Structure formats: C-alpha cells, structure tokens
Amino acid sequence: QPQPDQANHTVDFVLTVNPGRKYYVNQIHISGNNKTRDAVIRREMRQTEAAPYDSAKLNRSKDRIQLLGYFDDVKVETRPLPDTPDQVDVDVSVKERSTGSVEVAAGWVQDTGLVLSAGVAQDNLFGTGKSANFRIARGKTQNTASLSFTDPYFTPDGVSLGYDIYYRGFMPYKSSSSSSSNNYETTRIGLGARMGVPITEYDRINFGLGVEHLTVKLHGDETYQPYRYRQFIQEHGEKNWIVKGN
C-alpha cells in the first residue's frame, strides 16, 4: 500500500505478507513390495515423517528408489488428512521386477576345446537390498571361479561394504598346440574388500584392498620355458603374496 509524503516528495510502500499454511508429513505408507523389505525403501526417503513437507525432497526420494533397480514403476503421492488440515500422508507404491539371473553357456575354442561357464546373480538378496553373484568357467587350459557380495548400507548412513573371492588357473601347457612359449601355468587365489563412503547426496568415494596368492610353475624342458617366467621364479620363487589397493 503506497503512503505518499508530500513534504519530501517521496512515497513509502508497505508490503503485507500473509504466510501460507505449513504442511507436515504424518506417515509414509509403502505398498507393492511383496519381496523387498520396507526398510530398503525407507532408507532412500529424503522426506521423513513428522517433518515439514518438502516437494524437492519427495522428488529426490522417488529418484533414489527408482535408481535401486528393483522396481519397474514407482509412484509417490500425497494424501491430505481430513481431520488435520496441516498434515498429509505420503503413499509410495512400487511394482517389483525380477532382480536375479542365471546364466549357462558353452563354447568351443581352437586349441583348448570345449569351455563351459555358469553364473548366478541376485541384486536384491532375500529382499534386503544386498547383492551377490557367483561365476564359474572351466576349460582345458583355463579355470576360473569368483564370488562377490555387496552390502550397500553396511552402516545406516550409507557406507557400503563388499567382498570378492576368486580363483584363476591358467595352464597353456595343456593346449593341443603347445609350443616353446606355453610350458608354464599360473594359479591366482585372491580375496578383497571394497568400501564406498558417501560425501554428498550425489557423490561418494570408493576404495578397496585385496591380497592375492600367486603360484607360477614351469613344465618340460627348460629350453621351452618362457624366459620371463624363469626369471620371475629365480627372483621371487614359485609362490608369492601380492597386496593390491585401489
């Protein structure tokens, strides 16, 4: 409302602001998660119960739930409470998808023959949000196996922890076309741990540490053994422990 001042030839303006009603979230209801536990979804919510309603936090909550990869569809809706005009309930409805896979394969490789492989993976283990996968492959000259497990919420604030175990055996001396450069074998058995620490809502730092046991063996006449492997054994021996970090 303008208030003119004739003496000083000025005009004052008075702005009157009437703040709107502030809404609070009463309860958050989750439905459609027949397998996934409620806690897995609730920990992604940035909008919390008994807190002021924030549309930005609600949208971010929906994005985080979708990024889990466990659901084909995610809907987040608000519902006013008839008896309490300053409160709303939040309804989160999800449509679950398959989060597991099984793979079986067979192939033929020249010189090594038949190669068989199989694997099983689950990204939402028992509905806990943890993931695990196992892979195995077997051939004439190479055998591998690996097992991985990840807990994305090892701590309540989102620090993740994962483990990896693997075996890799490489035996080119068994090849049907074994030559002077193939008379050796290597075996690697490793164990590692991974950790991820969130530093912002969108960024995190990942690092890991592992240990590997390496065995190198030579076969046949020394004349047909790779020089670099003979040199490695002379300097370090057949068996070694290796520490890895990233």
Role assignments for model-derived ranges:
Residues Q1, D12, I28-N33, K57, ...:
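Acidic, glycine-rich loop-and-beta core segments that form the ion-binding/anion-interacting portion
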Residues P2-R21, P82-T99:
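Self-splicing inteins and homing endonuclease
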Residues A51-N246:
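Gram-negative/organellar outer-membrane beta-barrel architecture
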Residues K35-A50:
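N-terminal periplasmic "start-of-domain" segments of outer-membrane beta-barrel proteins
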Residues V25-I30, V102-A106:
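Disulfide-bonded cysteine-rich modules in secreted/extracellular proteins
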Residues Q1-P4, K22-Q27, V216-T223:
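Interfacial loop/beta elements and low-complexity acidic/Ser/Thr-rich segments
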Residues Q6-N8, R21, N34, R138-Q142:
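A generic beta-sheet turn/junction motif
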